[in-house]
Design a protein with these regions (language model features):
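Conserved AMP-binding/adenylation subdomain of ANL enzymes
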Residues: 290-308, 318-358, 373
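Conserved AMP-binding/adenylate-forming
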Residues: 299, 387-514, 521-524, 537
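Conserved pre-ATP/AMP-binding loop-to-beta segment of ANL
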Residues: 101, 224, 237-271, 278, ...
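Structural core segment of the AMP-binding/adenylate-forming
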Residues: 158-244, 347, 355, 363-364
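Adenylate-forming
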Residues: 189-208, 229, 337-341, 357-403, ...
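AMP-dependent adenylate-forming
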Residues: 26-30, 88-116, 230
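Conserved AMP-binding/adenylate-forming core of the ANL superfamily
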Residues: 37-41, 88, 103-157, 174-179, ...
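AMP-binding/adenylate-forming catalytic core of the ANL superfamily
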Residues: 144, 169-195, 353, 473, ...
Length: 651
């Protein structure tokens, strides 16, 4: 197989990954010839590897005498058990001058805001003082109901600076979704923006904020700001708590205070999607998340100081945490809040050109949407600084690789990356010193013993199986919130294979040492006892111009499972019988006869999580007349109605 892109030798030699390969080779008197050998060293010599990159990345903190305690235990291993570090300190206290740009924030109204490093530090200082006056201490929880703007970053860094725990939900969460999350984690302080705008529609969040503050007895203080509509609110004065306006930057900044927390001290609570019950509250540490995210930025993305790093995300998705960690590399992070198509397909690309982004991160769904429009970057849009496009959220189709290189930019590193909320980082991602192969994630992340297991727990190559990690790594969660004996934590990741992290993705390792993800394990189809990943079907179906997107489930029928394919058609397109035949032929030609759906049904929309992922399990439940456990976790629960009592499915 030929690569679709290869790095130039000059680029390889100047990369941080190449620098690390040479450093580890030199310091350990060995010769690591390529990325595969560097990766093998990183998982076979964990203590040396994590100590080396701590120093090489310039992290501020104390390592302690031991780099890894109980390496044979999973869970149970501890990285830097004597170490002390603070996530926020590493993002704020370095040699970036006060007049440099730390944050550029955009929203769909066209508003552009810049925060210098000095303004960011002064703003965090003011917010830190407000939290202290509210009685916030280490290990208290601060909850953000916030859009992706500077206020969210300021509040999070101030929270982390005190050793308190930051947890956030985006404005697309309704009251029940917020209570399902904050009701478990019991924040002491709520930080909230009163309005947002999405797809040109203003949304007033005041009533939701009042409701959650009334319901959450743990909340003693509400810190609020106007949001996009710039209207000051007075309704909060009636709440049985202290209501404060978001503070202005400090004019007489003293030296910022940072709690030197243990490496394993909790920093973030992130939430699972909650589509199978109440969301899991996943606890991540200062040290584990910081060292993992900075590693990904500096080596896997080759991010440098002063470069512009963008990822399209909300504060309810782990990619927001991933993005703000870019400050620790002294990069400028770019925020965008609103619809990525508010001004058409060019919306984000125009900002990319104006702001000189180096890294453009987005979702596979977004790239697919551009591809469906056959949009291409205009000739006058040179995008001179852009050198990497990152995609995540779902598998990036093989055809989307072609689209990026043919229609968006031909000389970029296209990194399909994958991990999850569970590890607030990636298992597989880009590698600037390796070639890109169509449809593949370039490789496993440094320090991560990623493998594919068959049903018996044996490693397999070029064969589909369970994505696992066989050795501990720093970004493993501390555990779940309110799970003192870690029973739920162990059940979630370590029951399938003893002492091995099972991630829940159905994947394979390729001959090029890359990876292909075929879908979620719990959504795998099983007709006639043969396991089929849904992504294999979606890839074929979404090549049809008439079809916007697809979702496949296995329907139990006559003591077997039949594959049912649901498609959303483009406007003014119909699912004709001849189109169904074409779909079946293409799937059969490019996969196997087992992949061919027994039924193909047109629906108006597919249900999605709040982070935009389609939910096969919820559809499967509706089709089998089973209850959907947590509709509040869906962005559009009304879409489930389209799957009820479909005549074809009753036959």
């Amino acid at each position: 197989m030929n690569p679709i892109w290869s790095p130039k030798q000059e680029f390889v030699l100047q990369s941080r990954m190449e620098h690390l390969r040479q450093r580890i080779s030199s310091e350990n008197s060995i010769i690591l010839k390529n990325y595969s050998e560097l990766h093998r060293f990183s998982i076979e010599n964990q203590e040396i590897f994590w100590r080396t990159i701590w120093e090489d990345m310039g992290l501020q903190g104390v390592q302690g005498e031991v780099a890894l305690e109980n390496p044979q235990l999973m869970p149970g291993a501890k990285f830097f058990p004597e170490g002390r570090i603070n996530f926020a300190k590493n993002c704020l206290i370095h040699d970036q001058a006060d007049d440099g740009i730390a944050i550029i924030a955009h929203d769909e109204t066209g508003l552009r805001r810049e925060l210098s490093w000095g303004e960011l530090r002064a703003s965090v200082d003011s917010f830190q003082k407000m939290l202290l006056e509210a009685g916030v201490q280490a290990s208290d929880v601060v909850g953000g109901y916030v859009a992706n703007g500077p206020e969210a970053v300021i509040a999070a860094l101030a929270t982390l600076s005190l050793g308190a725990i930051w947890t956030s939900c985006s404005p697309d969460f309704g009251v029940q979704g917020l209570l399902d999350r904050f009701g478990q984690t019991k924040p002491k302080v709520i930080v909230a923006g009163c309005s947002v705008r999405y797809n040109k529609k203003p949304i007033d969040l005041t009533e939701r904020i009042i409701q959650i503050c009334e319901e959450l007895l743990s909340v003693t203080h509400l810190i609020h700001f106007p949001g996009t509509e710039a209207v000051e609110r007075t309704e909060f004065s009636k709440l049985p708590l202290t209501s404060l306006q978001f503070p202005k930057p400090s004019s007489s900044r003293n030296e910022l205070f940072f709690e030197e927390t243990p490496f394993q001290h909790p920093a973030f609570i992130l939430y699972s999607s909650g589509t199978t019950g109440k969301p899991k509250c996943i606890l991540h540490s200062h040290g584990g998340s910081l060292i993992q995210l900075v590693k990904e930025h500096q080596y896997h993305v080759d991010l440098r100081a002063n470069e512009r790093l963008f990822f399209y995300t909300t504060c309810g998705w782990m990619m927001w945490n991933w993005l703000i960690a870019g400050l620790a590399t002294k990069a400028t992070i770019v925020l965008y809040d609103g619809s990525p198509f508010s001004r058409g397909a060019k919306t984000l690309w125009k900002i990319c050109e104006q702001d000189d982004w180096s890294i453009f991160g987005t979702s596979a769904k977004y790239i697919s949407a551009l591809e469906k429009q056959n949009w291409q970057t205009p000739q006058e849009m040179e995008l001179l600084k852009l050198r990497a496009i990152l995609s995540t959220g779902s598998p990036l189709a093989h055809e989307s690789f072609d689209y990026v290189y043919h229609k968006l930019k031909n000389n970029v590193l296209l990194g399909s990356i994958s991990g999850g909320t569970d590890i607030v980082s990636c298992f597989m991602l880009s590698c600037p010193i390796r070639a890109v192969y169509r449809g593949q994630l370039q490789g496993a992340g440094l320090g991560l013993a990623v493998d594919i297991f068959d049903e018996e727990g044996k490693p397999v190559q070029e064969q589909k199986g369970e994505l696992v990690c066989t050795k501990p790594f720093p970004a493993m969660p501390i555990g779940f919130w309110d799970d003192p004996d870690q029973k739920r934590y162990r059940s979630a990741y370590f029951e399938r294979f003893d002492g091995v992290w099972t991630h829940g993705d159905y994947a394979e390792r390729t001959a090029q040492d890359g990876f292909v993800i075929h879908g979620r394990s719990d959504a795998v189809l099983n007709p006639g006892g043969v396991r089929i990943g849904t992504a294999e079907i979606y890839r074929q179906v979404e090549t049809f111009e008439e079809i916007l997107e697809a979702l496949a489930i296995g329907q139990e029928k006559n003591n077997d499972v039949r594959v049912v394919l649901f498609v959303v058609m483009k406007e003014q397109q119909e699912l004709r019988d001849d189109l169904k035949d074409q779909i079946r032929r293409r799937i059969k030609q490019n996969t196997t006869p087992r992949h061919v759906p027994d039924l193909i049904v047109s629906v108006a929309a597919l249900p999605r999580t709040l982070s935009g992922k389609i939910v096969e399990l919820a559809v499967r439940a509706v089709v089998h007349n089973l209850p959907v456990k947590n509709k509040e976790a869906l962005a559009n629960p009304e879409a489930l109605e389209y799957f009820k009592d479909i005549p074809e499915l009753q036959k």
